[in-house]
Amino acid sequence: MSVRLPQSIDRLSSLSSLGDSAPERKSPSHHRQPSDASETTGLVQRCVIIQKDQHGFGFTVSGDRIVLVQSVRPGGAAMKAGVKEGDRIIKVNGTMVTNSSHLEVVKLIKSGAYVALTLLGSSPSSMGISGLQQDPSPAGAPRITSVIPSPPPPPPLPPPQRITGPKPLQDPEVQKHATQILRNMLRQEEKELQDILPLYGDTSQRPSEGRLSLDSQEGDSGLDSGTERFPSLSESLMNRNSVLSDPGLDSPRTSPVIMARVAQHHRRQGSDAAVPSTGDQGVDQSPKPLIIGPEEDYDPGYFNNESDIIFQDLEKLKSRPAHLGVFLRYIFSQADPSPLLFYLCAEVYQQASPKDSRSLGKDIWNIFLEKNAPLRVKIPEMLQAEIDSRLRNSEDARGVLCEAQEAAMPEIQEQIHDYRTKRTLGLGSLYGENDLLDLDGDPLRERQVAEKQLAALGDILSKYEEDRSAPMDFALNTYMSHAGIRLREARPSNTAEKAQSAPDKDKWLPFFPKTKKSSNSKKEKDALEDKKRNPILKYIGKPKSSSQSTFHIPLSPVEVKPGNVRNIIQHFENNQQYDAPEPGTQRLSTGSFPEDLLESDSSRSEIRLGRSESLKGREEMKRSRKAENVPRSRSDVDMDAAAEATRLHQSASSSTSSLSTRSLENPTPPFTPKMGRRSIESPSLGFCTDTLLPHLLEDDLGQLSDLEPEPDAQNWQHTVGKDVVAGLTQREIDRQEVINELFVTEASHLRTLRVLDLIFYQRMKKENLMPREELARLFPNLPELIEIHNSWCEAMKKLREEGPIIKEISDLMLARFDGPAREELQQVAAQFCSYQSIALELIKTKQRKESRFQLFMQEAESHPQCRRLQLRDLIISEMQRLTKYPLLLESIIKHTEGGTSEHEKLCRARDQCREILKYVNEAVKQTENRHRLEGYQKRLDATALERASNPLAAEFKSLDLTTRKMIHEGPLTWRISKDKTLDLHVLLLEDLLVLLQKQDEKLLLKCHSKTAVGSSDSKQTFSPVLKLNAVLIRSVATDKRAFFIICTSKLGPPQIYELVALTSSDKNTWMELLEEAVRNATRHPGAAPMPVHPPPPGPREPAQQGPTPSRVELDDSDVFHGEPEPEELPGGTGSQQRVQGKHQVLLEDPEQEGSAEEEELGVLPCPSTSLDGENRGIRTRNPIHLAFPGPLFMEGLADSALEDVENLRHLILWSLLPGHTMETQAAQEPEDDLTPTPSVISVTSHPWDPGSPGQAPPGGEGDNTQLAGLEGERPEQEDMGLCSLEHLPPRTRNSGIWESPELDRNLAEDASSTEAAGGYKVVRKAEVAGSKVVPALPESGQSEPGPPEVEGGTKATGNCFYVSMPSGPPDSSTDHSEAPMSPPQPDSLPAGQTEPQPQLQGGNDDPRRPSRSPPSLALRDVGMIFHTIEQLTLKLNRLKDMELAHRELLKSLGGESSGGTTPVGSFHTEAARWTDGSLSPPAKEPLASDSRNSHELGPCPEDGSDAPLEDSTADAAASPGP
């Protein structure tokens, strides 16, 4: 041969130059002659592989369509790889870019850490020289060439010095594998090329230029840089071997499948060359045997090109169903399919008709978007809320779903990128990529391959749990049907198909026990043969007929399947041994790859250990053989899977078979046994896999084996004759099948519970793996639960024994789901399910910390009876079972004739099932909430409250969250001011709202403050804990995501919190739950747990001198009633105060956009009697919430509506009355005198504040509250007047409930404080003693101010309200106690109070009234009037549903009178009692005593209860009329 042949060999050997010596690389023989191609054009194509370094790829490109290398960074990755300026880029990663835009080329280059470029540039001889110049080694080393005799048939060994040394045992880096593969492949290419060269005549036709270099730094772990130049042969040689010029060969994205086939192609080309050629350094050449493969004209370049393009973009994938099927197989087995399935279903929705899109939209919501959806996809919450809203309203959701698709796209693109990485490693054939080779652009063939891929998908689906597999199957069917691809039916519809699918049904119902089959059946034999050939496929879902057409092209006598990196590497390491495989010997485990890619016959070939593999792998294989010998029952078909998993586990420790996390991030499908999954992650844990498992099988397998169902028990039609089925209607057949499914799945569930008991619970208890407390949480009452289901299964068996057709099943259902049996089931199930999530978290922690427990869990979960399910999957089976009962019963009802007793009973059983499920869900929720509260309590930091001066927060310094029940929690933003917001985690407890601020791991309880409106220096402090019986909830009109919480406590001024939710739906949820919690807290205030440090009872004791009400509440108003109310509170308007009883209306006004929040506060309701503008505003802030706690009665709503009507009447008529302005002016004057603050803005103390320092003398205050003629009959009228309005029990915000006597105590305190403060009071005009009650007419309000009638003492029509003024500066402390509830004494009337007298004496009133300023009051009234109307409308709507009951109630209330206490919630009974003269106390009782005892006596103070009330029941009853 010519001397140039060794040069050629040497040129190609530079591919593996990692181990070459420097002289070798710099030998002068490397200079080459130009090829034919380069002679004509002067340009050659070459391929380079560039690895990105810290500076990127190190080159820039320019141009469009013709993309050129613009610049190369000196010393960068591109320069090391041999890229030159001016080179034209022909291909990127095997993709032709001659017609691609500049941006597309850049995108392709940046798609990974490696890029393979095919460049067209000037003759590379200069590059070869420059490359040599970079090598510092001396040149001119002599070359030794010799002719070596032919070696045996296997490929020759590369030069000894180029063989890499032993690799570290645990080195998993992908780059090292890739380097090793490329080296070995390229060495073989050298030899193959030498076979080819003689075929093409003289040396002039041999490649004279071009080289393939792979330069790596010494000690580098991977393929850092390299320059690849493929031989450029003559035109005919390039045509024959086009693959040689394709960068796909050495691109990081090239599959070893292609490499294997290229090698085979070359072997075919050179198989007839028998003349040995010379080689350098001992390289041998020998003739090759003729091997004919199935693909003579295979062009891997074209295939790689096309597939690379398709697997880059989802849009292209959608247009190629076969490629999409391959990608789906990867997604279903190695990643989360939810985003892709959601995207595809949304695509169908976009193109569906309106009718179809409505139903499909709901399915998409239920499967992908709902909170508990089985395939939940994460999209922005606002987008999710918008989709929900549109679907609920049957609106078109195409636009928002399109946005949701875009939100899911990044995750899908990441999965596509991961799959491309898998293809780079040669793993594409695992997912059926080999089938794509046969497409050839034939649409029919494309459809067939797609259907084949989807059939394989069905087998993968069968290994998922049913709650995931069913929706995944639905989504897949939806899209494929839309694309016109026929998908394998999950549940065949006709009888024959059902019979065929019976053995496979367990794949779709993982809880179904596998069926027993007689050992002599043909299916058994087929299954055994199948297992012998492919044992690993038992647990990764091998289809009945292989769905992958893989080609077996041996590269050496030891056959290696394409697509398995581990075996390819192992194969090349074993090449030097030339040993034939020993049949039947143990082979190395190959991880989770299907074995039909690794073996083609029933014999198992051993892949011997490589040079760098330790003996550890052999020891582990011995142990894995032991694991196969564990005893098992004949029905235990999954034992082979467990043994295979053990081998899988052991094989991972070999360095030659280890893969990096990048190469196989998830080396096994999601359905692989847990032991197999964990073993690859932690191979060191596999040392005792055969110790506990056999012991378990010997002890417990006998108990488990009896749980297997009878043959074909899962298919009802297999249990009855064809003649029986033929005589039934289709509806009855369907009904029997559903009943049979109920029976079979119940038996399967019972079996699962026994597995939990025998394999986990009993062993954990026996081996003390968990403390008893923890074990009791994980399995609290497992034996009881098993007994319940066992007894039901026995009843089902008895029913089944009666005959093949079950006529009636309702009695059996009711026996389990109704009556005492239902109570038993729901209690036991709730107890079992409550702590599961908590216990599973505990198990997770123990597995991380305790290796012994970790080993136990691995062994137990790998037990075949667990059916590849983990403990967390098994333990939730009870909860899953409870959800399936209503569905199964619904299906039975659907196929049962309506109107029959059977149908009715089944409907009842279904409803009871739903109640059981609801009960258990609530129990689980409450338990988890308690657990979370315990965690929050540990992180709670309330130190800031200890330093806070806020009285509201003081009592929560030692707040204990665990003593309360949590209703809801979530993030909210608190708008403290326009410029200040705070992110909170808010807890809604049964009686409190807690605003927590997160700081690191702590949850802070911290008071915040802001400047109060109206004063630049004073600040208002907000407590982070709010009592629900003192709050109101209102929406923010200008922000649909925000709502107000108005807190009204006696401990401080009213406060408004503006909280903002993430979405409007979140806000609605918060408001609904808050309102419900407020109702419950005000209805049952005693039920809420008391604070750890309740307020001191000191101030309350003196107030309770009189008889106390039967219901005692620890209310702020009760505790702190004696404290004068703060001066710092801004005031309200007089008109607002006028309607004192209407605190609900006032409280519900926060949405008004007045001057500021303080204005809203001023409008808040106050439980006191005074309606003075300023006083009322101030007062409202504190007392309101105290007035709320009252039991809820239906009549309370009616009373509230009556009060609204009455207040509305007075609000409307007040400004029309001639004395209106006088009252206002009179009200302002005394207030100015009494308080330093502006009369209309604020007051230092409230008329209703007990013991206020500024009370007027008794006479003065009494005058304010009394009418003109009261001097003679003062006690009755005063009492009545005060009681009538002030002491009407306040009603709750939502229902208008009247407060019980306790509220009256508060009001009494308030009244006394009003007098003390000298503030205004609004009282109802009372009739003079002995006068007749005049029925109130709507017009009677006009006569209210008329004092002349009252002066006579005989006429007082309607409910007349007057503003009572303090007489002057507070004189005596005794007057404080004068509650407004106690009537003022006649002598006190004249005492300096000109205002009351004008009211009482019409003549005097009129002149004074004009002097007052009505405009502000009128303006204020407008808002209140409209708000009152709104509230009244709401209440009347609610009253419509109980109109009849309301009328009866009015009748009963109208005629009722009580002597001692007023029934809580009854306005009319109170009125009746007040008008009852027999109850009136002595006429001249001191006011002081009244004020002190009034709040204990009920709705009215002692005096007030006796005073006749002018407002009759008739009046009250006449006004509402819903």
From Swiss-Prot:
Give the UniProt tissue specificity note.
Ubiquitously expressed.
What residue spans carry the Acidic residues bias annotation?
A: 1503-1513
Query: GO molecular function terms here?
Result: G protein-coupled receptor binding; GTPase activator activity; guanyl-nucleotide exchange factor activity
Residues with the modification Phosphoserine, per the entry, are: 2, 14, 16, 35, 245, 251, 255, 271, 556, 635, 663, 1155, 1295, 1300, 1457-1458, 1480
Bias regions of kind Low complexity — which residues? Answer: 651-664, 1338-1353
Q: Which GO terms describe its biological process?
A: actin cytoskeleton organization; establishment of cell polarity; G protein-coupled receptor signaling pathway; positive regulation of DNA-templated transcription; regulation of cell growth; regulation of small GTPase mediated signal transduction; Rho protein signal transduction; striated muscle contraction
Identify the CDD domains for this entry.
PDZ_ARHGEF11-12-like, PH_PRG, RGS_PDZRhoGEF, RhoGEF
Q: How is it modified after translation?
A: Phosphorylated by MAP kinase p38 (MAPK11, MAPK12, MAPK13 and/or MAPK14).
- PANTHER family in the record: RHO GUANINE NUCLEOTIDE EXCHANGE FACTOR 11, RHO GUANINE NUCLEOTIDE EXCHANGE FACTOR 2, ISOFORM D
Its function, per the record, reads: May play a role in the regulation of RhoA GTPase by guanine nucleotide-binding alpha-12 (GNA12) and alpha-13 (GNA13). Acts as guanine nucleotide exchange factor (GEF) for RhoA GTPase and may act as GTPase-activating protein (GAP) for GNA12 and GNA13. Involved in neurotrophin-induced neurite outgrowth.
Q: What protein name does the entry list?
A: Rho guanine nucleotide exchange factor 11
Query: Which organism is this entry from?
Result: Homo sapiens
- Underlying gene: ARHGEF11
